[in-house]
Regions:
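C-terminal-biased regions
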Residues: 1-76
Length: 76
């Protein structure tokens, strides 16, 4: 996995956590739980990608790849 994937998963986790939070406020607990589980899965996937990147990349490579990943998501 790449830092692109880690960034994408983290962005998805933030979205799903926000939806879960909003659903709690609406009293839709089934949907809140569904999105909380999805957020957790995305965070877990991001953690795996980040751990792999730590093993495979130098700090300089990680900085460059991380910047590209974030810019790509912001442009999407």
């Amino acid at each position: 996995m790449s830092l692109d994937e880690a960034a994408r998963q983290l962005k998805m986790a933030v979205h799903d956590a926000q939806v879960a939070f909003d659903c709690v406020g609406l009293g839709d607990l089934d949907r809140a739980q569904e999105h909380a589980v999805t957020a957790r899965a995305a965070v877990d996937a991001a953690e795996v990608a980040l751990a792999r990147a730590q093993q495979d990349m130098s700090p300089e490579e990680a900085q460059a790849a991380g910047e590209r990943a974030v810019v790509a998501l912001e442009d999407a």
